[in-house]
């Protein structure tokens, strides 16, 4: 399990490694062991999920995974979703945790089902499937400044890294906000909130006015307008962190939790079935939680 889900070694490679040492273990035998181990770990994974969703704030994200369609010789695109509980940035001693779920597609009904009992703050990207969760009034939306920054970075690169460009100015403003976060990392929520309101609040007001002014001067179909629009249409969710010290500026905690999935995806190419995706989600939950601790 560790070799496959932590070291990203597919079972056929593990079988080859054992064979070089004179131990004949067929890949199907190893797959059976993975399945049996997963069944034994189910109660622990369920408890981990309950613990993760007991947090006042969680980070969530998803990533595509190719899944073999039995009998068709083709793959489809499943999804691995992750919810991360990590309050170390606010000085909490509560252990961090990551809980993964697999689904055969990206329909919004899946995260809505996973989080139907959750009550608290959900920090995530702009995926539309989260919308009904926020509409219930039981989950508070917190958006991600890393996502808001990306279109500006792309524009900056396309300008040839022109330091005088509008994109460079936007990146500079966002960098000022992140500098404040570095100063207050590990502080309790009330201290973070006070510092943000005093230092980030005025910067955010200036940025909103600047973006609004720019939007009126550029073509509505331009990439610049899209970058501006991304931030302005999500402004309340993007700036909610300023008034709540528990919230982070971005959703990087969830994105980091999916890096291992991306590495594994590059090595074992696809999952053998939907059941294999569910097994992967369970074991990734334990592996990533162990890494966080």
Locate the predicted segments by residue.
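Catalytic center-proximal scaffold of phosphoryl-transfer enzymes
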Residues: 1-293
